[in-house]
């Protein structure tokens, strides 16, 4: 194992405390359920489908994205450091008859033993919750096969993202629990791409994720001011 784990105990506890409500479609994780079809479709389109491919979902939590990828025929491994979310994920997979594997580990430790193991790696809404996002990105690069795809999603750091993600989503609309995010840990696209460039991953595209509070819906678009997804490939 790595001597110093790239983990924030406060972040782990935050999601441990909410774990039992992970699959409540009207609970704290409602936004993840709402955006999941968009995330899944984006991954499917850029990775040319997932059927039969080995896929790693980093920071899988209760398994929302991991399960949906398994249902597309992927051989999925979900990775997380939260014990409670993983127990919820395993139980839900059992209840739905979805076949996939969940592992409690840091990505750094997993990468040390599984180099070039996966065709696709997803790391969604996770980088802003760890002390060293570059370490996570490097590990993702190590885990994916040459020619494979890695997807990162996170939040931009600017005034608009503070107003939307912190003031709006947490304080006013109560879409997510207050304290879920730390604006200082948000990552600008230029910063994320600079970190990606320090690996053998190549950025292939970037898209924004937009929330409409009037219709309570999300859509993908060009604007990356708040939430965004980056598609990379290993060459």
Swiss-Prot record:
Q: Name one GO biological process term.
A: methylation
Name by which UniProt lists this protein: Ubiquinone biosynthesis O-methyltransferase
E.C. numbers? 2.1.1.222, 2.1.1.64
Instruction: Tell me what organism the protein belongs to.
Output: Vibrio vulnificus (strain YJ016)
What is the annotated role of this protein in its UniProt record? O-methyltransferase that catalyzes the 2 O-methylation steps in the ubiquinone biosynthetic pathway.
Q: What class of enzyme is it?
A: transferase
Domain of life per record: Bacteria
> To which protein family does this belong?
Belongs to the methyltransferase superfamily. UbiG/COQ3 family.
UniProt keywords (A-Z) are: Methyltransferase, S-adenosyl-L-methionine, Transferase, Ubiquinone biosynthesis
Pfam families for the chain: Methyltransf_23 (PF13489)
